[in-house]
UniProtKB/Swiss-Prot annotation:
Origin species: Vitis rotundifolia (Muscadine grape)
Cellular location(s): Nucleus; Cytoplasm
Catalytic activity: NAD(+) + H2O = ADP-D-ribose + nicotinamide + H(+)
SMART domains (UniProt xref): LRR_TYP, TIR
GO cellular component: cytoplasm; nucleus
Native organism taxonomy: Eukaryota, Viridiplantae, Streptophyta, Embryophyta, Tracheophyta
Protein name, entry field: Disease resistance protein RPV1
Amino acid sequence: MASTSSFRASSSSSTPSIPRTTTYDVFLSFRGEDTRYNFTDHLYSALGRRGIRTFRDDRLRRGEAIAPELLKAIEESRSSVIVFSENYAHSRWCLDELVKIMECQKDLGHAVFPIFYHVDPSHVRKQEGSFGEAFAGYEENWKDKIPRWRTALTEAANLSGWHLLDDRYESNQIKEITNSIFRQLKCKRLDVGANLVGIDSHVKEMILRLHLESSDVRMVGIYGVGGIGKTTIAKVIYNELSCEFEYMSFLENIREGSNPQVLFHLQNQLLGDILEGEGSQNISSVAHRASMIKDILLSRRVFIVLDDVDDLSQLEYLLGHREWLGEGSRVIITTRNKHVLAVQEVDDLYEVEGLNFEEACELFSLYAFKQNLPKSDYRNLTCRVVGYCQGLPLALKVLGSLLCKKTIPQWEGELKKLDSEPKADIHKVLKRSYDGLDRIDKNIFLDLACFFKGEGRDFVLRILDGCDFPAETGISNLNDLCLITLPYNQICMHDLIQQMGWEIVRENFPVEPNKWSRLWDPCDFERALTADEGIKSVETMSLDLSKLKRVCSNSNVFAKMTKLRLLKVYSSSDIDSAHGDSDEDIEEVYDVVMKDASKMQLGQSFKFPSYELRYLRWDGYPLDSLPLNFDGGKLVELHLKCSNIKQLWQGHKDLERLKVIDLSYSRKLSQMSEFSSMPNLERLCLSGCVSLIDIHPSVGNMKKLTTLSLRSCNKLKNLPDSIGDLESLESLYLSNCSKFEKFPEKGGNMKSLTELDLKNTAIKDLPDSIGDLESLESLYLSNCSKFEKFPEKGGNMKSLTELDLKNTAIKDLPDSIGDLESLEILNLSDCAKFEKFPEKGGNMKSLKELDLQNTAIKDLPDSIGDLKSLKYLSLSDCSKFEKFPEKGGNMKRLLQLILSNTAIKDLPDSIGDLESLKYLYLSDCSKFEKFPEKGGNMKSLTELDLKNTAIKDLPDSIGDLESLEILNLSDCAKFEKFPEKGGNMKSLKELDLQNTAIKDLPDSIGDLESLKYLYLSDCSKFEKFPEKGGNMKSLLQLILSNTAIKDLPDSIGDLESLEYLHLSVCSKFEKFPEKGGNMKSLRELGLRNTAIKDLPDSIGDLESLEMLSLSNCPKFEVLPLSLKAIDAHLCTSKEDLSRLLWLCHRNWLKSTTEEFDRWQLSAFIPESSGIPEWITYQNLGSEVTEKLPINWCEDPDFPGFVLSCVYRPSCDYSSAYIFCHDFKCELNLHGNGFRFRDVCYHECWCDCHVNFKDSRDLVCVYWYPKTAIPEEDHHKYTHINASFKSDEVKIKKCGINVIFLGDQRNHMPMLEHPQNSGDNGSALQDANGNVHGANQDDEHYHIPLLDLLRNLSLGDNGSVVLEDTLGNRKRRRNDSLPDVVEEPLYKRLGGPHTEISL
């Protein structure tokens, strides 16, 4: 048996909204004399045995009117099975049945199953063979019915069905047909709604995890936060797969099954689905029903979906264990509680994550706009909503429906409300998970939502444990319920879930924040302060000082907070974020913190009850000590960074629970109280306490202290001997303690110490006891300029993995250094007195990195070859180092060898034995003349840097470097010829031959199939690019600047991937190849200072070209529309520049109707005598503001603005040849309290043959399209502002020009300039109101080009539209114009005498 397509019932795509009452499952249509007593009879019996109610017409009584009964039977059947046999079409009754069946398929969703019984389906479809013969007999008497019959046959034959041949037993064929029909009739497609965005990837992933090909029982869990789409995914999978199973069931809303009656109903539904509707109403016990379910499932292959499970008991009575299920069964469980899935021991877990931005935007748009994308006016608002929803489908649907068909102001109002009040439909769904928590977990959740979101998990556990909460269990429960996530061990929470937590806190007293249990918003804090009864109920408070709108000077603000557990008063700038930065950066952050802290002004009478306080953070705490009534008995952590504390507290405090004290950058702290009252302290941070002179000897009593940070304590000179008693200390930081001179002898007793940081101190030596630090892993002594000798016993530190001696006064290392068997990193760079590496250094078998750069070392001992683990060796800038040791080739794991700027002359042949070496740097080795022949054996080498060496050629073996990706030979003045076999380097991606004596390249260069970058600039003898160079299909950049090249071969057009081609300063280059236009990927073309006179028309075919640099303005008629920047600052011809600007402007006008980037086009040109007349500059200096024309946003003839400035390079580099200046151009539109800002950064290269003092002014012009400004905000803006900034140039003057579509004909008449009113005049005004430039008394003068474009456009039939000084448009038709200028516009602009098509 062969199926014509899939085993899938065919029905109409549109089903009736009202369900039909059906009497039969199947209506059998067949030709009686063909199959009544054989195939059809057997099929009818088989269908009956499967419980499929089947109608066949031979059950009718003889003589009864058959037609109406048939019609009714078909209508009352869910489906039809059509047996197409040899003589089927010879029966008009059969054909009429068929017509009715196909009508029901279209109108009622009637399923149709065709069977082609020993007939060719194509004969049925095309009415050929016996079907054609039958229709030939109908032509005379039944012409009116023939079209309907033919259509019905064709449609039925096109459906999926079965083609029965004589190649199999008929009984087997009937069994398969019956089973397939049974499955398809039993399939109940679940309603999944419309707008299923992003569902496909979830369904695909889940089907993979179900392993349908396996005969094992498999259970997969889907979990995620409420509203994320778990049920929808499960329904789609059910619809997709249920027909593949004989028995299936989808049980929804199981979380409600905690109620026995609901559980009873669910059990009955499951039994009914499996037993085909029979159920088990006579069994009342839930337990007995569970036993019955087990017995029934065990013998069947089932597909079951259990949706929204939240308790194990629900699974116990519905599914039990996997042992209940028959072979090949599949179960999907959806839940918010991951723990349920873990206990059920599902085979796989699938977490549903939120939609990505594009998917979220599409889903929201389908509900808000009834289309896939947001309307242009609503794009920014849509982004705000999508950002708010963070990929949650429920929220996107609810808010999309809410905002549908509302105006922009209404959107803004709704979004403002969302900040303080979530939508009820979203809140209700999310809150279900919270409602299922016990009292303690609810408290933990609210603490996380209102205080701890974004904090590290270990920190949160520590504080919550201090609150006497079972923190580990609570956080695990919340994670299982998807109320939080723990990426990178951090407490994270969806913003909508956090907002749900806030709403729970507010719900009893929505407008009385003084009664809330938690405060997190500064605005709510300020409102709470106004309450007469004070703030009594608060347990946690997080206060961002930077957001306080007014100064709080109430010293009693905390007086009634008797329940306060967690208090965080913090600055927007965290001083810890500046750690490691410069002193200036730290000072800047410190100033911000202190400025924020000044908003809380407390008097000496300040008090607050701290009996319940577990966590206190107060950045910039203003008083010199904590209040007298401060208790701290339950305090776990105390953070008073950047405070005014001089002494923490007075008298004795019982601080048994205290684990962390952080007083960093408390600059007035001169001493710490004795430490005996805090025996459990684990971390003490006093970094930046610049007044701290010493550490109290009682520090040794803190047996649990693991971290002590004293960085940048500038007055600290030593540590007490009791420091050695810190038996748990792991990290000790003393870096930047500039007066710290001596490490205590007893410091060696700290047996747990793993990290000791003494960077940038005044220490001179270390005691011998340092060798007793048996756990020490990292020792930092860099920039200790007085440190001269490493102790002999230092070799006893068997755990040491990193030793940093950079920039110390050390001269040598003791032989015991070889005993550091765990050492992996040794840094001796910048030790100017270090001359000799010890022979026994080769014993450091674990050493991976050895940095000796910029030392006085002359050679290395042969034992260096014994460093079998060494991967990195740097000797750069060792000016006395002359010879690499022969045995160095034994370092089989060496990856990187840096010998740059040494006195080395050659390398030993053993260098070829470095089989793992990837990077070899020899740049600036001025005596290095010859690369070894055996160097080609380094099969792993990926980068070889020979820049600025004395090398003349390369050996043929260079071609054997099969892994080489980068070869740098730049500035090798003696290098003349690239080897022919160099073409064998199939992995080479970058070849740098800049400033060499090379004359040509071999043809084999075309074999470098991976080459992406080829640099030949400043090769003054290089004359010809090889014809076969066009074979380098991967080439992205070809730099030929300042060579002797005259032309390029036509094959250059074959460089299909080339993006950058630079030929600047090629003084002999005269002709750009016609086929150059084939380089479809070219983005940047540099032709400055060439001898080229014109460009071929094919230049317009460079469809990706964005940057074009020119000199002498060669003639060309077209520019690519993709062009974004043109640099013509060396052009001197006024006429050529005019033509260039005209082409730019024309291109920009064309592009305003197409897709574009925000900054569509920019040009850099000289300010020659004619250019200032074309561009109106409204202001001296670097910034200008103008009023926008009335109705600028609605005007279809207004495409955008031109921003422009005149500048001059400001640096005085007399020897400079090429100078790069960076521009920052900022555009601002503002008005009515709204602002739009856009910034463009652009880089322009200047060939400077003279001092900058003698250079001429240059002009920068930006064309900016209106459509880059969000349309929904157009009506808000009244003014436009432009500013230009650059560190390398001085901005002299600038302007904004409003463009309106101008003359589209061959020329444009000149107009008399309107009287200067300030807005539209071309004169310059300085800050004092003085006018420069134009003479206001002149009656006639040439209007600048951009003024002309600003004030002139064509109306219908050639009428001229003028703007007055207020921006109002006036129409003049057939008015005579002043005959001041007769020269056509195209001559004045240099534009071609052709029509402009926009």
